[in-house]
Amino acid sequence: MAAIEPSGLHPGERDSSCPQEGIPRPSGSLELAQEYLQQFKVTMTQLQQIQASLLCSMEQALKGQDSPAPSVRMLPTYVRSTPHGTEQGDFLVLELGATGASLRVLWVTLTGTKEHSVETRSQEFVIPQEVILGAGQQLFDFAARCLSEFLDAYPVENQGLKLGFNFSFPCHQTGLDKSTLISWTKGFRCSGVEGQDVVQLLRDAIQRQGTYNIDVVAMVNDTVGTMMGCELGTRPCEVGLIVDTGTNACYMEEARHVAALDEDRGRTCVSIEWGSFYDEEALGPVLTTFDDALDHESLVPGAQRFEKMIGGLYLGELVRLVLVHLSQHGVLFGGCASPALLSQNSILLEHVAKMEDPATGIAHVHTVLQGLGLSPQASDAELVQRVCMAVCTRAAQLCASALAAVLSRLQHSREQQTLHVAVATGGRVFEWHPRFLCILKETVMLLAPECDVSFIPSVDGGGRGVAMVTAVAARLATHRRILEETLAPFQLSLEQLTAVQAQMREAMIRGLQGESSSLRMLPTYVRATPDGSERGDFLALDLGGTNFRVLLVRVAEGSVQITNQVYSIPEYVAQGSGQKLFDHIVDCIVDFQKRQGLSGQSLPLGFTFSFPCKQLGLDQGILLNWTKGFNASGCEGQDVVYLLREAIRRRQAVELNVVAIVNDTVGTMMSCGYDDPCCEMGLIVGTGTNACYMEELRNVASVPGDSGHMCINMEWGAFGDDGSLSMLGTCFDASVDQASINPGKQRFEKMISGMYLGEIVRHILLHLTSLGVLFRGQKTQCLQTRDIFKTKFLSEIESDSLALRQVRAILEDLGLTLTSDDALMVLEVCQAVSRRAAQLCGAGVAAVVEKIRENRGLQELTVSVGVDGTLYKLHPHFSRLVSVTVRKLAPQCTVTFLQSEDGSGKGAALVTRVACRLTQMACV
């Protein structure tokens, strides 16, 4: 496009060489005008291509790819949360660079309520030219003096005033309060500032001033301020969009996707810096000759090409270039371009906005053009208005394509079928232009139909928005401190775990010697573990709840085959007479034998009986009390093996050889011991927790004999009932204990097992909610409900992908409304509770394996532990944490953990077979 030189006339003057008014337009002029306007038409395909290209560039930048170099920067702003309406307090804002040669100081009061949520007062200070061009220290000292002067006018307490700094110059931000100036713009040329942390320079100046105690909390750009400053609605505002002199957007990205952060959890606000976007294949086809001319005339040709098609600084200039071209071709103004029209930047954004107004636009066209020394005809005014519409429509559509890329990014990264989000809008193009937002909305709906978007005008992003960033940062810091203080008692040191290990060793020794101890150390009369030679067919019974299992276990060389049948125990049987219960059990056994073709055979039988018993022999167990909803009369205080044998006798013609009554923990050890002869410990971590191990018989005071081994049922859930664990207990443990059916008992179990961990978490969440840290401080009935937070939720939450989707789903199903910060904190609470549980369990295992090693006088011990229980098996980190703790506390022991397969069935059968083997050996 040919360069156009101004003729040197003043605005308002007309060139005397211009053709006379009223001369008709040359033929074909309307077609020529249409041709020029057509250049600004952007097709849906082109918009989709721009959307895809920008999205690709965004993702490249997020990943830190530099080849090919992405055309957008995707800068982390270190703003990690959006407002949730409870922010309150007084905040200072210093705004420098947003309004040219002046700075603004604001006092913003946030009330934390929906009504009158924000109150502000402000003062503007003109920056002298010698300060703008002087030393950097002089500028920041001036800013500090302005802060003091502003505060002097109001009665404020000089106690840690929180300040947000809006510094509108290109910076490299490395933290919320760390930002290095890249280069000055907007006429500022202060020496000694470029390459320096401007937040620190401001802090130093405030300290030199020495008048007020001001804490600079956050450095914020105007786009982020726009997002943070919008009114709270029914959906989260997680996108900020500025179309002012320039254009930019920011949004809340998953932190794990931002390579520059190297973080896994939470979100961070990313400033896209999309004004620099350029892709020849996508953007090239929509660039016009007028865009090229504008770029050539700009201060930095070739840069910010996308911004130069959208930003308010350029829209008026694009309109001017089109009008000049049309006039030079005789289409407008009788072929006459006035000197003012030929002058760069003579048409501004405010002119374009007024001329395009549907109601008063034509009148404004005449006013603006006459001010440029032109005398437009009616047809000229109409065409000028069409030019304005074409330029601005394209700008809105291009902006929409970029916004659609951001929305698509949000939707796909969060794996949401429909994204519901609010976009905060700010800038004079939105404020002044009547149609820009309408076109933007319509185009976004076409380009991102899967996104449900509401647009909310931001109120004073540079002031209120910066204050809100500061308030949110202060809130997060306070909440983080409270969370850490709350969870600190759950962070067990190596010294604490070593103490637990030592206390358990002492309790084990006292229990074995028959002295007073919280560990009962019960002999199980299982004297050996499998040696791999076990063969044969066995029956096993498993009674531990409302379902009862009968199993046929076939042990062959290298394999164990299990066939089982589940039978229900009706409530009237479970709570009727003992005779009726055991008759029902025998009926089930007989039915199973018929189904398996075993009628008339007398197979050795092992009985897993998961109720509290005092065992007097391998086949003698006195029921202490019923649990789990059973209350059959005439059983407590009786030998349950005897009751079973009596039921068999009553049935007649049934031959069953009851060899052993088996505890489920022992069954777990024996089940794993068949595959690994080194397995000498059993561990259950499920609804409850317990452990057993092979002790030297000489150490068991209650059983005569000096040689051989005896499996000891530790009943370690009661460890600490003597008060030895009181130093580890928290107020949350105390609340759970007091609400339990057995206050003061099973203290170790209540800190470890699945029955209680969810309740501990629930009490912590209640506490944090009461302090306003979680769920906006809003207490809900669901959190007040006992056992509403299932322990399985811990496994699901801690198994969650990095997006914390499972956390949100679980809590929302419970009726809780939460933010991403809430989800992250709930995850941390779950991790703290389950980590402590695993570490305590590990300390217990370490005590046992060290006891085995010292019993045998070994320098090094290699031993395996058979493990069962839903918490151990299903929790994603529990088993690893147990193993790590054991390695730290028992470094001389090499411990392998084996997950048991059907300890109640296979284990009971193996106990039975080992007992038979030992009996046969004794006979020989």
Curated annotation (Swiss-Prot):
One of its GO terms (biological process) is glucose metabolic process. Keywords: Allosteric enzyme, ATP-binding, Glycolysis, Kinase, Nucleotide-binding, Repeat, Transferase. Residues 663-902 are annotated as: Hexokinase large subdomain 2. Residues 531-662 are annotated as: Hexokinase small subdomain 2. ATP 1 binds at residues 95-102, 438-439. Hexokinase is an allosteric enzyme inhibited by its product D-glucose 6-phosphate. Its EC number is 2.7.1.1. It catalyses: a D-hexose + ATP = a D-hexose 6-phosphate + ADP + H(+); D-fructose + ATP = D-fructose 6-phosphate + ADP + H(+); D-glucose + ATP = D-glucose 6-phosphate + ADP + H(+). Residues 221-460 are annotated as: Hexokinase large subdomain 1. Pathway: Carbohydrate metabolism; hexose metabolism; Carbohydrate degradation; glycolysis; D-glyceraldehyde 3-phosphate and glycerone phosphate from D-glucose: step 1/4. Residues 84-220 are annotated as: Hexokinase small subdomain 1. ATP 2 binds at residues 542-547, 687, 754-755, 791-795, 870-874. D-glucose 2 binds at residues 610-611, 627-628, 663-664, 689-690, 715, 749. One of its GO terms (molecular function) is mannokinase activity. Belongs to the hexokinase family. The N- and C-terminal halves of this hexokinase contain a hexokinase domain. The catalytic activity is associated with the C-terminus while regulatory function is associated with the N-terminus. This is Hexokinase-3. It comes from Rattus norvegicus.
